[in-house]
From Swiss-Prot:
GO terms for molecular function: holo-[acyl-carrier-protein] synthase activity; magnesium ion binding. Its main location: cytoplasm. It comes from Mycoplasmopsis pulmonis (strain UAB CTIP). This is Holo-[acyl-carrier-protein] synthase. Belongs to the P-Pant transferase superfamily. AcpS family.
Length: 108
């Protein structure tokens, strides 16, 4: 049997509106924080990163410190080494689905 490591997180965007800079710096990497400072849609940016990082943690408990997880986005695809990430948003929610890639754990 192959073990599939997945994580899912659903976030209500309004929960991350008007967060203090101290809070934001605790969960975003330095690169993410620079992007956050430039965006007008701060709550959506923060909710998306939060959902992805929570889903990563649920898929693989090795990632404890959100600030050390740097999520990149290229060609509208979110990336973090070793994981496939899917994100969707609708009105007031963001959902992230994460699967660890290359896991070959077998149980007898």
């Amino acid at each position: 049997m192959t073990l599939i490591m997945i994580g899912v997180d659903l976030v209500k965007i309004e929960r991350l509106e008007n967060k203090s800079d101290h809070f934001v710096r605790k969960i975003l990497s330095l690169d993410e924080y620079e992007l956050y400072q430039k965006t007008k849609a701060k709550a959506i940016f923060l909710a998306t990163r939060w959902a992805i990082k929570e889903a990563l943690f649920k898929a693989d408990n090795q990632h404890f410190c959100f600030k050390k997880i740097n999520i990149t986005k290229k060609d509208n695809v979110y990336k973090f080494d070793g994981f496939a990430i899917s994100v969707s948003s609708e009105k007031e929610y963001v959902i992230a689905f994460v699967q660890k890639i290359g896991v070959a754990c077998h149980r007898d």
